[in-house]
Amino acid sequence: QSGNGIMVTASHNPATYNGFKIILQHQVISGETLQQLIPMMRDENLHLDKPPESMGSLVEADIVSQYLDHIVDISRLEKSFKLVVDGANSVPGPIATQLFDRLGCLAFPLYCDIDGSFPNHPPNPADEKNLVDLQRHVIDQQAELGLAFDGDGDRVVVISGRGRIVWPDQLMMIFAR
């Protein structure tokens, strides 16, 4: 395991945007600390005091299977169900579909082919117009629910089996019960 990483993401923003999340020693770098890094990142003449090969190592790893194994190990579904996953042509779509399949559910993928131009709709589930296709597919597939993710999976909106939007604040009320 590593306590460090960088995720290139624009989250729920349009394709013209990009950014990243930095994790150092298991802590997300944000706020003032992140602001202090920006001038260094913009500095084309940035020189390191040490040669790059002496500063550590870079390891590229496919962490998806390990992540899915972990989630499956700690999950306890009482019953399987049918759902539609709208991935908005972003990374969470195929991962969520694999996860629910592994949990014994029947997951129908919708826009789960990764394409950063977002040809079907922007990866913003907070915008109702981006949920119309998912609502229709949930009803057509007679699914129990639908999930709409943003570009990096830190936002989700649920669609009920009747095609009704269940907003995140409503989900919190359900979870509080």
Where does each model-flagged region fall?
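Ferredoxin-reductase
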Residues: 1-25
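Structural motif
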Residues: 3-6, 21, 82, 106-108, ...
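Short, ordered loop/turn segments at secondary-structure junctions
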Residues: 10-13, 27, 34, 112-113, ...
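Gly/Ser/Thr-rich loops at beta-strand to alpha-helix junctions
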Residues: 13-14, 89-93, 153-154
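Gly/Ser/Thr-enriched, mixed-charge loops and adjacent short helices
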Residues: 18-141
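Acidic, glycine-rich loop-and-beta core segments that form the ion-binding/anion-interacting portion
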Residues: 123-177
